[in-house]
Amino acid sequence: MSAANMPTTTGAQGSGNQVPTTSTTIVNHFRELIKDPKNLDEASKYLFQTLLDDAVVGIFNETHHLRKSGNLAALDGVPEDSTYRMCEMPNLDIFGISTAKKPMDCTCPNCDRLVAAARFAPHLEKCMGMGRISSRIASRRLATKEGASSAHLHSAGNAGGTDDEDDVDWSSDKRRKKSNQNSRNNGSKKNNGKTF
């Protein structure tokens, strides 16, 4: 058999009007060539040419598809040198990100003020009136309101209040005096002015 009689794939001889062969046709034709020991050289050339043509056509088809779909640049990849350059500018780390601390501000939902993040919790506590001092002020207001209402009841002749209400007022005055004495010592409790 000569090379002109052999079936080829579309790219084997370079002409576009040849009929593409299937793998079963290629295998069957190769088996026929192997039956005769004189044709082994021709069979090996045929097999090599068929495999080479198949690989080349596959690469051409894949490249054409990538070019038409716009993905051909993805084969080139990204140049490695530019991505791994270190930044040597002041106030930037090696990746070019700023190392300076940025002040974080929060907006108070109650009064719509900008407050530093570190001061947001204490501000919100005072702003909403929920802090320790605010609760003390609120309890004093309640005590004065109850005292005023009980005085009003006493003046009307109704004795609805109890003696415990008077005790609360008396004990709170005592606490104030004690706290004033502690503040005179300037917070020092070591020796209370005594020398050893």
Swiss-Prot record:
One Gene Ontology cellular component annotation held by this UniProt entry: nuclear pore
Biased composition (Low complexity): 180-196
Localisation: Nucleus, Nucleoplasm; Cytoplasm
Chief site of localization: nucleus
One Pfam short name: Sgf11
One Gene Ontology biological process: regulation of transcription by RNA polymerase II
InterPro entries to which the protein is assigned, alphabetical: SAGA_su_Sgf11 (IPR013246), SGF11 (IPR051078)
Modification Phosphoserine occurs at: 172
SGF11-type zinc finger locations on the chain: 106-127
Record keywords, A-Z: Activator, Chromatin regulator, Cytoplasm, Metal-binding, mRNA transport, Nucleus, Phosphoprotein, Protein transport, Transcription, Transcription regulation, Translocation, Transport, Zinc, Zinc-finger
Family: Belongs to the SGF11 family.
Quaternary context: Component of some SAGA transcription coactivator-HAT complexes, at least composed of Ada2b, not/nonstop, Pcaf/Gcn5, Sgf11 and Spt3. Within the SAGA complex, Sgf11, e(y)2, and not/nonstop form an additional subcomplex of SAGA called the DUB module (deubiquitination module). Interacts directly with not/nonstop. Interacts with the AMEX complex component xmas-2. Interacts with Cbp80; important for promoter recruitment of Sgf11 that is not associated with the DUB module.
Domain comment, as recorded: The long N-terminal helix forms part of the 'assembly lobe' of the SAGA deubiquitination module. The C-terminal SGF11-type zinc-finger domain together with the C-terminal catalytic domain of not/nonstop forms the 'catalytic lobe' of the SAGA deubiquitination module.
Protein name: SAGA-associated factor 11 homolog
Highest classification ranks of the organism: Eukaryota, Metazoa, Ecdysozoa, Arthropoda, Hexapoda
Gene symbol of the encoding locus: Sgf11
